[in-house]
Amino acid sequence: MPRRGRTSLPWGLLGLLGVLLGGCMQTTLAPSSQANFTPRDRQQLAHPPYARASIPETYQRHIVDYQRRERPGTILVDTDARFLYYVLPQGKAIRYGVAVGEEAMAWSGVATVGRMSEWPDWIPTREIQERLGPYPSRVAGGAANPLGARALYLYEGGKDTLYRIHGTNQPEYIGQAISSGCIRMTNEDVIDLFDRVRPGATVVVLPPSRGGWAGGFRS
C-alpha cells in the first residue's frame, strides 16, 4: 500500500494548481476506438467476465483545454474530480474519467512512470486478503484481473511508490470513490493511455481536499 501522509510538493501549492483545472471549459468527446488493440486485447475484451457499463458522458474520454504548464507527455491525476489528464501540445489534454480507490488517497506529489505492463498479474497484499479475500497468492493477467489490461507503476527517487494507474474489471465505478485500489480506468482508456505514455514520463498527483471526501468511499 502507498505510504501514508507523503507528498512531494506543498499542499497549498498543489491545491492551488488544481484549481486551475476549472478553466478546462471547452471539451470535445473522443470516442473509444479498438484501432490500437493487440490480438490479445481483442480476445480478452470480446466477451469480458463483467457487465459492460454505461459510463456517464462526463467521465468518457474528452479532448479539453488545459491551462496548466506541464509539458506534453505529462500525466496529471485529480483525485477529487476523478479525472486523469494526459497533456498534449498547444494547450490541450486528453481527459479520462477514473475510479479512485482508498490507496490512491494515500500519496500525492510528483513521480515518474518507472515500469509499464500489459495484462499484468496481480499479487494481493495481506491487507487486501484480510479485508476482501480470500484470493490466490497471484492472479494471472486477464479480463477478470482487478488490474485490467494495463498498469503504470509510479516511482519516486528510483523507488516504487506502490501507486498504480491501471485498468479494471469493475467499469461501473468509473467516476466514483471506492474502498480499494489505486487509480482505475476502463480497459479501453488505459490501453489508449498506455500507448501514449513513455517510461520515465512525469506524473503529477494532486492531493485530495483537506476537508475529506463528501460521501466517503464505496465498497
Language-model regions, residue ranges each:
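Short, basic/aromatic beta-hairpin or loop at an interaction surface
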Residues: 58-60, 173-181
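Bacterial Sec signal peptide processing site at the extreme N-terminus
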Residues: 18-44
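Gly/Pro-biased beta-strand-loop elements
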Residues: 50-163, 194, 211-213, 217-218
